[in-house]
Regions:
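Beta-rich carbohydrate-recognition and catalytic domains
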Residues: 1-103, 107-154, 159-178
Length: 178
């Protein structure tokens, strides 16, 4: 959101809390623009096993910084999300593609690694990491499939149980802009 007005600029992550998911209290800005650019969407995880080395049960956020190029950066919170410290090694993932954004991270228990899905142009990149800082591109999806009338963004990838069975399938959600 833009803390200074309703127009599109100064994109920042805000922080709000709720006890009932109906009534919300604004806690202030969580992650603000820096030399890499404004702060676009991303995701946050709780690093229960301290794989990143920031501390036990640290909240780790990955977000898109939108400057000259879109890059992926990390920030972490050791106080349950009240304040965030930007990782000194930012950005952690770069690309020369103009539309390179919206990281969604999750722990993959099957391979004992973090996974992330990230939109790049009109396809998705799937990465893995053992420490949330160094990421390896594992695969790409979508260049030959689906709708290509706009930029792919805000992906989600989740493992879901097939109803009535002991089997699981992966489900990909993708939004198209415009």
């Amino acid at each position: 959101y833009n803390p200074y007005g309703s127009q599109w600029e100064n994109m920042t992550w805000g922080h709000s809390t709720s006890k009932d998911l109906l009534h919300w209290e604004f806690q202030g800005e969580a992650i603000e623009p820096d030399v890499w650019g404004t702060i676009f969407s991303g995701s946050a995880v709780v690093d229960h096993n301290n794989t990143a080395g920031f501390g036990d049960s640290t909240v780790v956020a990955m977000y898109t910084t939108a400057g000259e190029n879109q890059t992926q950066s990390l920030a972490y919170s050791t106080d349950n999300g009240k304040t965030f410290t930007k990782y000194e090694g930012n950005p952690v993932i770069t690309s020369n593609t103009p539309d390179f954004r919206d990281p969604h991270m999750f722990w993959n228990e099957d391979i004992k690694k973090w996974n992330m899905i990230l939109a790049e142009g009109q396809h998705m990149n799937i990465y893995s990491s053992v420490d949330l800082k160094e990421w390896t591109l594992e695969s790409q999806f979508g260049a030959e499939y689906g709708n290509h009338g706009g930029v792919w963004e805000c992906p989600d990838l989740m493992k879901m149980r097939v109803r009535g069975t002991d089997k699981y399938k992966w489900m990909l959600i993708c939004n198209i802009n415009p």
